[in-house]
């Protein structure tokens, strides 16, 4: 496909148009700068049209294919993130199984550090991070954390940092294996926290693209770190509503939803509106407003987002997935309201049977 190529020139780069001419127009050069293409990337191809959905392809330092999309396309893709939940559910066991295995690798091998980041991603719900945000806004995520952002004391890690939108985060987690790995990463020179040693023993800094490549290597699918936040948001709000139980009136149901969303937003580090719009499956909330809610989880199988109970899906997760699928089928088959029919103002509680 015709496009623009980046070529090394002195300490910087030249950009070559499809006709082989060096691009010098300031507005074009500003556009390329705004794409924030890492200097280490090679075989860089840039779309000739600024509104093309795929803006950049390249190879990273390890030879892996990388992509940059137009923000508008990313917004469209975000609209399908709730569908991506089900794709993640198919392979989450693979990710958890591989993470548990890779954490035990010797030294600070690449896959060991990637597994550690993914473990923390799922356990703490800290954003994956972006070099763009770290440089422009001094806000951090897992892959952009600095050594100063974590304190390790025995088996406990405590992360304190400024996140997206200036929100201050203080997150503690206790795990002996993870604490030891993070402490060893801290001991490597360089301000970045997460680093690994490549096959030649050279230090490499972990980037978000590395973590996504690790997830895609495991699953063979386009799974990214961001998918974990949608998964967690839906599971957390379902957990809160499940504990609250059905409401007696629609007004009470709306209040309960707000409370559940607020708890979830606090865990994710989002505002209520952002959390509700982007990280909670809408079928879950519409079902609750109609009086349909998951029954309480038996005490012996209660699920905690902070505890890993093996690679398989946990009982709460399986229940939520089955519930949402059931609601989607119900909504698909539900006849449209006639001109004379009115929705009930008071929801009728109905309990779904727990999964066997």
What are these regions (language model features)?
Residues 1-140, 144-257, 261-268, 276-277, ...:
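A positively charged, amphipathic N-terminal helix/segment that binds anionic biomolecules
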Residues 205, 243, 250-356:
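Acidic, low-complexity interaction regions
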């Amino acid at each position: 496909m015709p496009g623009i190529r980046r070529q090394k020139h002195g300490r910087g780069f030249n950009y070559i148009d499809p006709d082989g001419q060096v691009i010098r127009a300031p507005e074009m050069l500003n556009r390329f700068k705004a794409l924030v293409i890492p200097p280490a990337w090679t075989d860089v191809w840039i779309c000739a049209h600024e509104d093309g959905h795929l803006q950049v392809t390249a190879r990273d330092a390890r030879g892996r294919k990388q992509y940059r999309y137009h923000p508008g396309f990313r917004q469209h893709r975000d609209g399908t993130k709730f569908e991506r939940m089900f794709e993640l559910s198919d392979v989450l066991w693979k990710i958890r199984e591989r993470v548990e295995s890779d954490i035990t690798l010797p030294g600070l091998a690449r896959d060991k550090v990637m597994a550690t980041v993914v473990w923390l991603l799922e356990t703490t719900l800290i954003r994956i991070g972006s070099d763009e945000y770290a440089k422009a806004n001094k806000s951090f995520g897992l892959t952009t954390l600095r050594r100063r952002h974590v304190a390790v004391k025995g088996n406990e890690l405590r992360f304190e940092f400024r996140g997206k939108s200036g929100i201050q985060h203080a997150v503690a987690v206790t795990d002996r294996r993870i604490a030891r790995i993070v402490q060893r990463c801290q001991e490597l020179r360089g301000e970045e926290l997460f680093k690994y040693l490549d096959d030649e023993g050279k230090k490499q800094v972990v980037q978000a693209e590395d973590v996504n490549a690790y997830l895609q290597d495991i699953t063979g699918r386009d799974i990214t770190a961001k998918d974990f936040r949608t998964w967690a948001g839906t599971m957390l709000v379902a957990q809160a509503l499940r504990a609250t139980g059905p409401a007696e009136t629609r007004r009470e149901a709306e209040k309960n939803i707000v409370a559940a969303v607020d708890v979830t937003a606090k865990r994710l580090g989002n505002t209520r509106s952002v959390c509700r719009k982007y990280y909670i499956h809408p079928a879950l909330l519409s079902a609750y407003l109609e009086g349909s809610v998951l029954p309480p989880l038996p005490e012996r199988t209660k699920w905690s987002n902070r505890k890993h109970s093996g690679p398989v899906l946990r009982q709460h997760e399986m229940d939520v997935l089955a519930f949402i699928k059931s609601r989607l089928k119900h909504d698909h088959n539900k006849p449209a309201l006639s001109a004379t029919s009115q929705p009930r103002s008071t929801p009728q509680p109905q309990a779904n049977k727990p999964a066997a």
